[in-house]
Structure formats: structure tokens, C-alpha cells
């Protein structure tokens, strides 16, 4: 399990204003699995782009900072953010689809089949937020939707974001 260790920015249960540093030690590493990544880039991964962007000086073990391990840090940041939200802001989330399957009873089978094929599947996660203060964000580039989309696209697996009625 990923156990957080708070390194800085917290004192007596309160944030101090200093940078909040949370460390998650990864005890499940398999660096040898990435030995061929520099010669055979993985489809839909950042391996090739990282190699060229950093002139071959990137560390391919585990995908580096392009890894899905980034998700644990984003989740930790989300936990902290939820604690500082104003009262009345609520979230309702659900997994709406996995690999084309919309029946929650079938999700496990879709995931097992993908794992057996050593493949991955896409999905749709729905999040509804209520009680958001009026006037949140700024015009144009810093609108609430722009900032939320920017953050969501920081998650490596995210390929699309919908607001309101979505793409319909």
C-alpha cells in the first residue's frame, strides 16, 4: 500500500504556509522491466517524446515523471484541497464506463480480460460538483472550466473532458 509520509508544511495538524511535501515510497519497483524502452517505445506513452525532449537524458525506469505513479501525488493534493473547500461544496463521483461496459457488475470481468491480454482499457469517470461559489475563476484563460481541464489533463490517462451536457 501507498503510505504517505508528510515531510514538511504541517505542524500540529495544520498547514504552515510552507510547501506541503508528501512522500510515497514505492516499494513495488521493477526497473529491469524497462530495459528495452529506449529502443522500443511503448505505444501511447511518453517514452519517445521524453527521449527527444531531454536529448536521451531521461530516466525510462517506470516511466519517470510520465508514470501513472503521478496519480498518487495528484490524489494526495486532492485530499488536501477537499479539506480547504468552503462548507457546502460536495462531490458526487462514479465510474460510468470501463472498456465500453456501462454495467458496474461487468467491470471486473472487463479488467480481468484486459489484464489477461496484457492490455489496457479506457473508461469514463463522472464527477458532479455542487455548491460551488458564484464567480469562481477569471475570464478567458483562467475560467473555472479552463483551470479544471488543465488539471485533469495533467493525469496521464485523461484524453477528454466534458462540462455540462458534454459532447452531446
Language-model-derived ranges and their functions:
Residues 1-168:
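Generic N-terminal targeting/processing segments that precede catalytic cores or assembly contacts
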